[in-house]
Amino acid sequence: MGLRTARLSLRNPKFNIRITLFPMVHVGEPDFFQKVYADAFSHDVVLVEGVRSPITRRITRSYRWIKGSKRMNLVLQSAYSSPPNSTARIVHADLSGEEFAALWRKVPLRVRAFVYVAAPLIGLRHRWFGTRTSFAKGHSLDDLPSRNEVMRFSPETIALTQAVIHARDVRLVERLGEELDNPTSGVERLAIVYGAGHMRAVLRELLQRRGYRVEKGEWLTVFST
């Protein structure tokens, strides 16, 4: 038992580029991150996420503060760095800090205030009272939105969802398209190492619009319970 993520290999017979998806959870056991990085950076190109902004530093306290929990004993995902012998080209497939800040300013003030207050409280709750089991239950994700996700929709949070999810989905798909549409790139194997919640957009692009098919799936253990 524990939390797992699915490593997916996709292929379109009409194109040379094979794609591997690594849906990420940003907290896990060291072995999980080591395996993912070693595998991903054996590809020709790696698309990665990361918004460098003081805003994201504040709102990611909800999981970053788990690092202090002796009960959970998990580590945070480290910065992307290729192994010494890797020749992979790293592509930043995310918003810049300035772009994210511009979208964040469109979020209603009371929603921003709530996020700023709630994030550290959630982080402290995880640190002091959380268990691996409770954290795993809160991070299950299917290919399609669940009933609970649909029911949680609120007009007040549209701008928040746009900043945190949708705008970043668009940028990721744009960067993916640039790689796939470049006939002279010489790329044969492409990896996407990105938050699990963003992989739905990638799968829609690859399966529905570009004719890719899942060739192989493999479970990776983020952490055991």
Which stretches of residues belong to each language-model region?
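Conserved, well-ordered alpha-helix/loop/beta-strand core segments that scaffold catalytic motifs
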Residues: 166-167, 173, 179-183, 190, ...
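A cross-kingdom marker for long, charged
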Residues: 186-225
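Structured, acidic catalytic/metal-binding patches in enzyme active sites
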Residues: 1-167, 178, 182, 214-223
